[in-house]
Amino acid sequence: MPSVDDSIQFVRGIGPKKAKLLEKLHIRTLRDALETYPRDYEDRTHITPIAEIDMEDKYAVRAVVGTEPKVNRIRKGLTLVKCTIYDETGTLNVTYFNNPYAAAQLRVGQEYVFYGKVQGYGRGRTMFSPQSEKVAPDADHPGRIVPVYPLTAGLTQRDLERVTAAALDTLTGEWPDPLPELLRAKYRLPDAVDALSAIHRPKTKDDMAQARRRMVFEELFLLCCGLQQLKERRKADSGIVFTSNGLDSFFEALPFTPTGAQRRAIMEIAADCASGRPMNRLVQGDVGSGKTVVAAGLCALAAQNGWQAAFMAPTEILAAQHAETLAPMLDKLGISCTLLTGSMTAAQKRAALAAIETGAAQVVVGTHALIQQGVQFHRLGAVIADEQHRFGVAQRAALSAKGGSPHVLVMSATPIPRTLALIMYGDLDVSVLDEIPPGRSPVETYAVGENMRKRITAFIDKQVGLGGQAYVVCPLIEDSENAETKLKSAEQHAKDLQKLLPHRRVAVLHGRMKNAEKDQIMRDFAAQKYDILVATTVIEVGVDVPNANLMVVEDADRFGLSQLHQLRGRVGRGTRQSYCVFFGADKGQVARERLRILCKTGDGFEVARADLAQRGPGDFFGQRQHGLPALHVADLAADLALMQNAREEAEALLAADPTLAGYPILLDRVQRMFAEQNDEAFN
């Protein structure tokens, strides 16, 4: 009797060669095959008579092969197989590209169900490269819902179906269900065996929907259990205790009145740091909400209690900017601020490292250089990571390891609806900065088409003439070779703008430049040595240039809404009225509607909600902390209610049984899900 832990290479029709290819999809055993869910489904249950095909679309057709399939070698690298098929209502051409085996698989006079895209009209109607299944003589309705699996070069859907069919044959009572029976009953979820069968071999759309609902709940429940265990495990560690006696002097030293949200976040941090457990908190806020002030509050707390704080930024130029912002705030309190970056001279590094090791450097700001082996902290008590999606769990852990169990504060400028944040960052507590400090005027935002090109170029010239500076952002570095989607690159835009505005100073910045070169260009732009900076999205998280008051984004339909909102946040940081112009309003109704959202609101949380709803979570949460388990089934936009249920149930279960000792199957699945974490909480 085959077992779910058997190797897939012994499945008939697979063998060692295809087994190697399947490994690329992380499929080594039959169990892996069962846990590799279809990425899509093709509904072939609706059979369309040939005569009723009236538009270019995918169809399932039950028809007989009418002419002998002929192999035509058009040229090297291109083979066509052509035949005609017919049913009671009409005939249809069939063409396969580069699949000479199709000629051997189809027999004249044999009936098949063909599924594929039909193009053309009248006698020219053709179904291209369809899937086909032979109709058994006694079959009255052979159409079915067919799973579509992820593939890699050298594998076909039939290979995945073979492996999955063999895996499904092992599904018996031996398949353990990680979901407690009470939960399955409460949410009316099918058991694991029925759900897996319906995921891979759905009989109806309802079967498929119920199975998916079960798998989504399971995935989110396992994730929430693991994150909750991780959080509780960290809380069990003894942490450094900071008293908050000096907070009043910190607030008094600020050159402005903090917002209510800033004050609330700092008080939440102070409470965490006084609890005797290591803090692990995320502060998220919109562009310009004042996260650096919150970080300064933690730095002050650490220093006032005799400990050091380390502040990591994703780029050297941002690290320098943070140091410049923090130094005057902390200097009033007698707290020193030291910068450490990779590009410093050897003498500068030696001086900084000595100050860090002796404790003379109370607050240290830097990049990944802070986690290198040569950096020895005297008494590291707090770690701050800016733009956490650019610093993974591993880097945070490496810095934390330098100080035992320091307090950790993570800052993100990507606003996320709070319900989602509590789940996606379930290993962290969450503070939200939902107020913008007074004095920042809204950025006037416009969505335009190519017909406005000359006017926008003139507007750039006008704003520079009035003393401002402009960003122009492009999605590509070099020109696209695809004529249909040809997008002008950053380099070409810079050349064109320089020709149109020869009296203006134009610079170009993109991701392929060396860090030192990028930093120098940004410093020169900030020092007003350039009027216009043409760039790719490397400026999305960039230096603060208060004098820049115009952002122009080319091909804005190529960016996500949240990314466009981040880009808009590069301007509006000074006293000048600022503007943002998105090109792409003439790219169709969908593009127009998306850009209209940005024109209507400057609220990053509102933009994030729209982004999730429109793009789905895949791209949006590509920014999730690296190192935590990926979601394979759940859709964060569509499954919000199930997500909330899963979180509540995980918290309730772990409150009653923190180690999951009474749920060994669930514990095993959680450990497997978090295996790559290699965290002691799961050993």
Please give the residue ranges for each predicted region.
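Short, surface-exposed secondary-structure boundary micro-motifs
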Residues: 64, 117-118, 226, 556, ...
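OB-fold nucleic-acid-binding modules
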Residues: 36-66
